[in-house]
Swiss-Prot record:
This is Dihydrolipoyl dehydrogenase 3. It comes from the Bacteria. Its EC number is 1.8.1.4. Homodimer. Pfam families: Pyr_redox_2, Pyr_redox_dim. The lineage of its organism: Bacteria, Pseudomonadati, Pseudomonadota, Gammaproteobacteria, Pseudomonadales. It catalyses: N(6)-[(R)-dihydrolipoyl]-L-lysyl-[protein] + NAD(+) = N(6)-[(R)-lipoyl]-L-lysyl-[protein] + NADH + H(+). Belongs to the class-I pyridine nucleotide-disulfide oxidoreductase family.
Amino acid sequence: MKSYDVVIIGGGPGGYNAAIRAGQLGLTVACVEGRSTLGGTCLNVGCMPSKALLHASELYEAASGDEFAHLGIEVKPTLNLAQMMKQKDESVTGLTKGIEYLFRKNKVDWIKGWGRLDGVGKVVVKAEDGSETALQAKDIVIATGSEPTPLPGVTIDNQRIIDSTGALSLPQVPKHLVVIGAGVIGLELGSVWRRLGSQVTVIEYLDRICPGTDTETAKTLQKALAKQGMVFKLGSKVTQATASADGVSLVLEPAAGGTAESLQADYVLVAIGRRPYTKGLNLESVGLETDKRGMLAQRTPPTSVPGVWVIGDVTSGPMLAHKAEDEAVACIERIAGKPHEVNYNLIPGVIYTRPELATVGKTEEQLKAEGRAYKVGKFPFTANSRAKINHETEGFAKVIADAETDEVLGVHLVGPSVSEMIGEFCVAMEFSASAEDIALTCHPHPTRSEALRQAAMNVDGMAMQI
């Protein structure tokens, strides 16, 4: 039985980053992963391939519509979907090979197979051929990620009724794509196929899109997506979906009750969220339990069992790759005897549509519920010079600060390239910056980031460019 300082079950963003940091700190480490490639859902069938398609589809729509023509670029593009998928796959392959290189560089053993616990300090790995290998470790990190949440009454066959993985590799552009769920996954993948020519209808049980985000930014995003042609049926639920060789027949009902309606689609994407993947881990062998969703109840990263840690989507908090990465670093450094904590109040979230939505910290709704006094500064991209000359003026920046101390409590952005701007406020808020600190900090001109400074100025009504 081979022995390690740390054995990590799962090779996604949490698992592979934990393995790399363990190697950097001089720990002997093995990462158990049953996929043929490292990177987990995010790299293989999630974050990265979806961004590749979002980028390509955005350029295609710009070239085939009025956007390029308005700039004096007159072209008539032809969609080569097979090539678009090929470049997406090539990008993903390059990234997975990069992780393999980092494993070799940091002396991480990749044990190929599916891991399960076998009591404290032991992991059994089952390879594809059925053979099993036992590993021993001082510390075990569970980083098995998540899987798409199924919808009762709707059977995902990945032929006509698909999950997010299926939506990344459709063989043709659907005439009509129905998306069940108006969260990150549904809106991003719905945007891809709408840009490529699909009619897209989004069905959401709640009366709003982007649950959990700032209401005002979500409404602005919905308005922008609707203007682009995306159809929303909010406050609705799918009670039946029947697939055939050439499409899907759906039955919808109002969430609050009422008259049902029928809907036809070429494909249906079920994107109602994700749930922790803890099947087959044999958690009971170490005395760990999960809740109804399969989530490990213990707060991350240490569990109630000495020597067993849990990070990423299998535990509480947002199911985001960067949250898993932060937990990975904190977990391994604590194993190595170094103090390290994750600031769960400052985990940013992004929706990579056009316009983009980005958020960090508290929303107005949360602060009202807490009874905390606050002030708000907003600045529209219509008043930002770079946004105007680039003809991307939808959206705004919103900064929320404490009414007395002026400390920034939350930042909510909807607009062009805001995914690349939210990090500024993550840093600022980590150091308890005030809105005035941001307002007094020079920003380059002309950039979209100036909208952030102007919003911070406007917390006290002092924006200069509106």
